[in-house]
Amino acid sequence: MRLARTIGTVTLVEPHASMRGGALRLLVPLGPADLAAGDGAAEPLVAWDDLGAGDGQLVAFSEGGEAAQPFRPADKPVDAYVAALIDRLDIAGTTGTTRHPTATRNVGKNR
């Protein structure tokens, strides 16, 4: 599982029938340096989100075959899945703690 920040929503004109009940979110993965700076510079990716993450939300996501595991035995065409909404992340370092407040959760907005 990795950490990312949501930066947008991907809208489909005609989604696959199994893609109802959630949203495709655009994520920027965050590495250790990105977390310390509070920003990410990695290439964005698209992830399935049925938790209702809002723009700017810090999330944990999984990729590959593991991303489809929550939907077994049903098939869902996903390669990345938002597995958790992060309320707060404290990073201990030599200068103290960096806190990452997250955006207000948009419950139901993307459902």
Question: In which residue ranges do the predicted regions lie?
Answer:
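Short aromatic-glycine-enriched beta-strand elements
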Residues: S18-L27
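Short, structured beta-strand/loop micro-motifs enriched in basic residues and often containing a Trp
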Residues: A37-L45
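C-terminal structural segments of small proteins and small subunits
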Residues: A60, E66-A103
